[in-house]
Amino acid sequence: LVTAVNSSDKKEFFSAKNEILPAEEVFEVKVLNNSETFSIRWDIREGYYMYLDSIKFQDYEKPYRILNSEISSYEDEYFGKTKVIKKIFEIEIKTEDLMAVDGLVVQYQGCSEQGFCYPVKKHKIL
């Protein structure tokens, strides 16, 4: 399959707005803790979103609390109606719930509004 592309189309296709950024730059993870709580915060770059259902912990099943997050419904081409998060997603876990955990790994997935979706990303927290 060969497609003809004129020079103005090439310029648009290779422009900075179509650049695929590393997931770490798009979904920046920050960890904060004190004696009572442990918080994980994602700063999500403008023009991107994370799937709420994609956020899972390996070997950890206790509840966590969602803070400072704007969750909205989204009609996804592949997943249908789903919940997504834009800008900030923050969760809080009680420190005492982590005492019996050897390590904490969280996984998540998100996409750009231009249509590029990142593979599931795993991030070691502890």
What are these regions (language model features)?
Residues 1-126:
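Structural recognition of alpha-helix starts/caps
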